[in-house]
Amino acid sequence: MRQKIVAGNWKMNGQIQQVTELVSQIEELIGFDCAAQVAVMPPSIYIPKVRDCLKTGKVVVGAQNVYPKDYGAYTGELSAPMLKDFDCRYVLVGHSERRQFFHEDENFVAQKFHHVKDHGMIPILCVGETLSERENGKTEQVIAQQVLAVSAKGKDCFRDCVVAYEPVWAIGTGKTATPEQAQKIHQFIRDLVGEINDSDAKHLTLIYGGSVNENNAKALFSMPDIDGGLVGGASLNAKQFVEIVKCIN
């Protein structure tokens, strides 16, 4: 059975009081048996604080970014061993904002992906097309390139990882793919991975990220190949985020 996941990407938002209150409210509101693994990904400076605030075991902490070296002269960066010291379970790699603003290419994303796996954490590989790429019929071509970039290490590379489909045109815009559009791409990704390792494809957790909110989550999560969500803006509101989590049930 595939792991269901709802992950909140807080991006560069919040200060210590807001972060503390938000994570405490989320835990308090999840007073039910949850079918999904719930994760929050605060700005890296607040990872220790969030970890220390988590009391119930119903929410885990993750990281938004990583640098693919264990240590060294890489000013301002954080390695997987450092993140693991603070109990990070998930790490985002390849988010469209990293690709766009920091010019991270496929090779660099692949290095991050395997660096996270090599240190016993779970990478969430983000893939997705821009509006221009979609309008030009290149969606599957772009996503295949992004997915297959991490496959150089062999047929087991998609074991113990998550892939998030985040159409770039839907991030922070209020637009979202229809459940049917999202399902089509999720099925494409699963079939693509199946060409490498059929067993891993069947067990691969695929989540959708692209303006997920409490109004569209239930329809999205009802699709057969959508196993949860990567939530942006709505994860900064505890009530909205937990309403999304409830939709997994």
Swiss-Prot record:
Locations listed in the record: Cytoplasm
GO cellular component: cytosol
Catalysed reactions, as listed in the record: D-glyceraldehyde 3-phosphate = dihydroxyacetone phosphate
InterPro entries: Aldolase_TIM, TIM_sf, TrioseP_Isoase_bac/euk, Triosephosphate_isomerase, Triosephosphate_isomerase_AS
Cross-referenced Pfam families: TIM
Pathway: Carbohydrate biosynthesis; gluconeogenesis; Carbohydrate degradation; glycolysis; D-glyceraldehyde 3-phosphate from glycerone phosphate: step 1/1
Active site annotation, chain numbering: H95, E166
MF (Gene Ontology): triose-phosphate isomerase activity
One example of a Gene Ontology biological process annotation: glyceraldehyde-3-phosphate biosynthetic process
Enzyme class: isomerase
Superkingdom of the source species: Bacteria
Residues that, per the record, bind substrate: N9, W10, K11, G172, S211, G232, G233
Signal peptide residues on this chain, from the entry's feature table: none
EC number: 5.3.1.1
Keywords: Cytoplasm, Gluconeogenesis, Glycolysis, Isomerase
Subunit description: Homodimer.
Homology family: Belongs to the triosephosphate isomerase family.
HAMAP family: TIM_B
Function: Involved in the gluconeogenesis. Catalyzes stereospecifically the conversion of dihydroxyacetone phosphate (DHAP) to D-glyceraldehyde-3-phosphate (G3P).
Name of the protein described by the UniProt record: Triosephosphate isomerase
Organism: Legionella pneumophila (strain Paris)
Gene encoding the protein: tpiA
